[in-house]
Amino acid sequence: MKWLKQDSGNFEDRRGISGGGKALLGGGAIGIIVLLLNIFGGETGHSIGNILQQTQGSETGEQTQTRALTAEEKELGDFAESCFVYNTKTWTTIFDENNMTFEEPGMVLFDDGVTTACGSATSAAGPFYCPGDKKIYMDLRFFEELQSRFGAKGGDFAIAYVIAHEMGHHIQTILGTSRKVRQLQAEKSEVEGNKLSVCLELQADFFAGVWAHYNQELIEAGDIEEALSAANAVGDDAIQSKTSGQVQPDTFTHGTSEQRMQWFKKGYNSGDIKQGDTFSALLN
């Protein structure tokens, strides 16, 4: 990916810092609670894409620098921040074109654990968006596991895709889509609620594709393949097959590998947010 360093006042790099919150989320069955978190990644041994559980008794404390970042880590952080800025610029333009006002989210890089307005999480939760504080949270070491454990190609555009996917969840929060889904899920069975989650996640993949469409000047040969490889690796069917050897469609919350690639490509090829109604396409 062709990129130049971009800076944002809404970007925080907390890597190498301890304190500022006690990570309470570890393992076990994770369910839907008050705030639905649209998780991209997940926990080893559990389906990538689980819902993050809100925790109680989160502790806050003084933050202290515990280690210096390596040059490679700093560059990766600069890349993530730049992708975040490219996303905010693109969605500001799209919202302007549709006579809407875009509210810029925040983004936080962290190591090991983090406390958010939606609760506390370990890195095992994977990248996620918290609607409570409208911030994207990410431990960049997730992408090492994406390659080594789930077979993604890797590459910088895989990171760009995930950031764009999480930005898609912010778009859904602004538009009220996430709130409507939570309301509907409260009235549905678990299986029907899972189908709504799949629609929400695939729409975020579609929005990631729309972002890529608007940023053709940044894309190099092989970049789209990196994004599709990441999407393929985190399909519910692919993850369940690798982690348990069994595929249970009724438990899907993010969609199959094929669906995730399909909706990203649709967004990328069209660049038209009006074509991203995954709910009508999948539920009717």
Residue locations for each model-derived region?
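Post-HEXXH active-site segment of zinc metalloproteases
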Residues: 173-201
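Short helix/loop segments within enzyme catalytic domains
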Residues: 74, 78-102, 192-195, 199-240
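Long amphipathic alpha-helical segments used for membrane anchoring, targeting, substrate engagement
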Residues: 1-67
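Short pre-active-site segment immediately N-terminal to the catalytic Zn-binding motif
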Residues: 142-161, 192-198
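Acidic/histidine-rich, surface-exposed loop or edge segments in extracytoplasmic proteins
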Residues: 60-77, 142
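Pan-zinc metallopeptidase signature
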Residues: 234-284
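Active-site recognition of the HExxH zinc-binding catalytic motif
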Residues: 91, 138, 161-174, 204-205, ...
